[in-house]
Each structure stands twice: as structure tokens, then as C-alpha cells.
Amino acid sequence: MSHTILLVQPGARPETRTYCDYESVNECMEGVCKIYEEHLKRRNPNTPTITYDISQLFDFIDTMVDISCMVYQKSTNTYAPYNKDWIKEKIYVLLRQAAFSSNT
């Protein structure tokens, strides 16, 4: 488990910048999914169930002006930066594992 900081800038203005911290990379990726789910709920307030596929999630990530992670590296006692593509790859792996687990 590596402490992970999610840095998000959804809009062009610097005031839209925010961050969240998580105890692990997987927890952070779940957090990104939750951000998207909250976005969908705001856009569709009368829809009782929110569904989406991974391509829609990735499109949402791509609309962000900036989204990146800083992941703690125990060996160097520093945080390493990771970009949108890395985040999408980690989300893909997480969701694939979740789908595999639910099918067994």
C-alpha cells in the first residue's frame, strides 16, 4: 500500500484545482471512478441507476485539464508523478480484476 495523492484540475481556471489523498493506488483509482459517477449523478439527477462503460470514463478523464497522481515510493522516501495515461491503465486493470472476481 502506497500513499497516493490525486491532483485534479477539471477546468481551465486554476481555482478548479483540488486534491484527494488515499492509502493505496487502487483506492485512488476507485476514487477517480467515484468522481465520474458523481458527475453523472449531477447531470442525470432523475436517473435511479448510473451505468457507464470504461470508454466513457476514459473520455471524462481526457476532458480534465489536468489529472495526475503522486505515489509514495518507500525505497526513496519520495513521491513519483504519474499522468493521465498511467491512471487510465491502472483503472483498466482494477476494473478488469473486479469483473473477473465477480464472474468467479
Swiss-Prot record:
GO cellular component, as recorded: nucleus
GO biological process, one term: pyrimidine nucleotide biosynthetic process
Description of post-translational modifications: Phosphorylated in vitro by casein kinase II (CK2).
Residue spans crossing the bilayer: none
Residues bearing PTM Phosphothreonine: 18
Top-level taxonomic group: Eukaryota
Stored Gene3D superfamilies: Enhancer of rudimentary
Keywords: Cell cycle, Phosphoprotein, Pyrimidine biosynthesis
PROSITE patterns named in the record: ER
Residues that bear Phosphoserine: 24
InterPro entries tied to this protein: EHR_sf (IPR035912), ERH (IPR000781)
The family this protein is said to belong to: Belongs to the E(R) family.
Known role: Acts as an enhancer of the rudimentary gene. Has a role in pyrimidine biosynthesis and the cell cycle.
Protein name stated in the entry: Protein enhancer of rudimentary
Origin species: Drosophila melanogaster
